[in-house]
Amino acid sequence: MNNVLIVQRKHINTFPKHPHISQAFAHLHICTFAHFPSIRTFPKHSHIFYLMQLYGLLGYPLGHSFSARYFADKFEREHIDAEYRNFEFDNIEEAMQHLMALPNLIGFNVTIPYKQAVMPYLTSLSPEAEAIGAVNVVCAQHTDHGKLVLHGCNSDVIGFSDSIRPLLRPEVHKRALVLGTGGASKAVMHGLKQMGIEPTYVSRTATLGRLTYEQLTPEVMSDYKVIVNCSPVGMYPKVDACPAIPYELLTPDHLLYDLVYNPLETLFMKRGAAQGAVVKNGLEMLHLQADAAWQMWHTN
């Protein structure tokens, strides 16, 4: 019986301030820990239980992610009784059905490819997330009536801005090329504008207001001294790939920032460094946005 939790019906309302927990177990009499890995019990009082705080990362695929290890280390280091899971789903609707059924969910991070796809499922957005048009942090709140309220935020812009700011030289870095047009690029564009840098998208297809890789002439490369890779090109396991920019036109005045952090030095960075450019990966951004996400989960 060591791996069985007995819930006596007369004790179901042990948590009047947390009706969502009581409701989640109202139909139970006996359940196994295998079904509820986040349950904690008191050995001498089988009717008393609580659910650990649950956090996680939504995305697909998640093989490249450091987030689960980052938060596991944080919980152990700071003695936080919580769990961080990878929610790896190839379908956003199925993913949200799963997440919204978790009674102990406090919040979750969002990564590729769901930073925009998750937005229709949210109850509200922070002003910054709304302005950016992408969400990478979701805060979950359970109402007294058992309803789950999901609030979308964006900590990518904080992580990116705080990470790149020390490397910027205002007299040189006035314009930026942003490679890729996904959810992360929206936060980068927003952050660059906030720092007074004029950003321009670069994509493989011609679109109004954007440059193509073929349009990166010597004049353009001389004018745009900051280049941010927001695409997954060069990410493990495809480490021999890099964005198709004219690396021979780079100079020591150029700053190349790669949101990819696995590998720690991408081919994009190596080729930039070979030309004397300043280079940086996205690992510090990951740490800073994760710290900001933690604050959002506990203040929203």
Where are these regions (language model features)?
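Short helix-loop-beta connector
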Residues: 169-174, 252
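NAD(P)-binding Rossmann-fold cofactor-contacting core
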Residues: 195-211
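Short glycine-rich anion-binding loops that position phosphate/pyrophosphate groups of nucleotides
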Residues: 110-117, 184, 232-235, 262
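Glycine-rich adenosine-cofactor-binding loop
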Residues: 59, 154-157, 164, 173-193
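Rossmann-like adenosine-cofactor binding region
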Residues: 209-280, 284
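Phosphate/diphosphate ligand-binding glycine-rich loop within oxidoreductases
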Residues: 53-167
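Active-site capping/gating segments
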Residues: 162-163, 278-300
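Short polybasic linear motifs
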Residues: 10, 14-19, 23-37, 41-46
